[in-house]
Amino acid sequence: MDTKDIQKAHGHWILAKMGKRVLRPGGKELTKKLIDSLAFNASDDVVEFAPGMGFTASLTLAHKLHSYVGIDADEDIVRMLSKKLQSAQASFNLGNASQTNLKSASKDKVYGEAMLTMHADHRKSEIIREAHRILKKGGWYAIHELGLTNVD
């Protein structure tokens, strides 16, 4: 979450520093719809890619789950969320969405919001492949992303 050097800081962190709290397409309404559509239950093992400030993680953890893992590449975020959202079934891991180091076929539901949009096409493919790898057979991968359409 380093925003000291504006030339090197990620745009979403600069906006957050300026007070912008909802940095997702469709706002909180679409986030809630995504979470509702996942229909969490007490046996679910869930992974969130790039939980950021933890809004969606807090909605997810309001459900009874078997386990929740948030994977974020920012050490400050992992530390902050580990303190802010303490739960027996939750953990926040420092890592990369394209290489989580989680066991194959071990998760029921994986989701991420507005994070694929920020990556190059080859990285998007790697992240989607990783979601597929860690999902159990019949598991769900839910995303909330920008869609761009050429009007020409």
Question: Where on the chain are the PLM-derived regions?
Answer:
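Class I SAM-dependent methyltransferase SAM/SAH-binding core
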Residues: 52-99
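A short acidic, Gly/Pro-enriched loop at the edge of an enzyme's catalytic core
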Residues: 98-110
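Conserved class I S-adenosyl-L-methionine
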Residues: 43-52, 142-152
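Conserved alpha-helix/loop element of class I SAM-dependent methyltransferases that forms part
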Residues: 24-42
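A short glycine-rich, Lys/Arg-flanked "PGG" loop and its adjoining helix->strand segment in the class I
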Residues: 125-140
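Class I SAM-dependent methyltransferase Rossmann-like catalytic core
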Residues: 9-28
